[in-house]
Amino acid sequence: LKVTELADRLFISPASVVRFCKKLGFSGYSDFKASLRMDLFEPEETPRKSHPTDFFRDIHKTIEMVPEETVERIVELIHCSRRIELYAVGSSSMPGSELAKRLQTIGKAAFCYDDSTLMNISARQLTSDDLVLALSISGETSLIIAAATVAKSRGAALVSFTNLGNNTLSGMADENLYVNATNFVCSGIPVQSRVQLLMLCEYLFFRYIETYGDCLLYTSPSPRDSTS
């Protein structure tokens, strides 16, 4: 339900809905909706035995949590930003790296960092013309939070990609996208998929070229990139 639709049903303005959400402690209507979904979903504190179809359930829940109005604002931030820096570590770095490569093919200055030193060097060079996309399932990855804090102090906009729920990174961000990433146990090994992050990154890219495709410079990836 979009904010305009809710406002129409309540016979108030969209701005009144947003103000009410902020009074409740949320950054806006999108965060309020995400928190409401979190309350409706049964939390899973410990890993549980999984079935292959459980991953599809997580993907479906993630799709349900994508607010189009938030995506539109992030797409605009990507378009208007001088540089786009992606911060991600571990398994989350692959989706970030893929998004950076895709943005580079259309002429955007996009770079992905998975090293704390490089993240902090990057963050110290940013300005209010730049954008940081920070990927952390937990939203509590200390390396990313430290770099994001520096980037925010420099005036850069911050978009977080985290698991559904309250966390430090989403609380810092200007815009938030959430995934549903359940902890599973496969053959005694804890597993948490990152395919939802990759899906969100892919969706953002395709929404971007759908919106701004007519004014983009496309550069074909090198044979080395296409075979990697």
Locate each region found by the language model.
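Short, flexible micro-motifs
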Residues: 18, 28, 91-93, 142, ...
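Glycine-rich phosphate-binding loops that contact phosphosugars or nucleotide phosphates
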Residues: 79-199, 203-213
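Conserved small/polar residues in nucleotide/adenosyl-binding loops
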Residues: 218-225
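HTH-adjacent hinge/linker in prokaryotic transcriptional regulators
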Residues: 1-73
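Residue-level recognition of alpha-helical structural elements
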Residues: 67-70, 152, 216
